[in-house]
Amino acid sequence: MSNRSYAEINLHITWHTKDNFPFISERLEPDLYAFVKNRIIRDPQTYFHAIGGIADHVHLAASFFPPFEIDSWIGQMKGASSFEFGKSLQWQSGYGVVSFGTRDLKWVVSYIHDQKDRHRTRKLSERLERFRGD
């Protein structure tokens, strides 16, 4: 792709722990989120916006710059985090991806940061909670 090309690809991504087991403890959560964020920041094909979730799944918002393969990217992120945290973290196969416009970025970031409250009060976006796994 030429450096004169323009692409605006914003994605909301979610993936779950193996068997939806609550692997993401309050103790593990900050380290996991920092690990994922740092990997994204170091990747020149991605721009980090937000990460959040609850004990059995992660939500992530990022922008992607071509060329990229989302399936491969998510697989590498899940694999690297499992390797980093060992048996204390296992992921289910599959994921959910939803594209969104830049005008919705603020809302998506807020949705991700408010995951615990949204799940507690059941104020969820069906579209952003979709996931296809085992």
Per-region residue spans from a language model:
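Basic nucleic-acid-binding interfaces
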Residues: 1-134
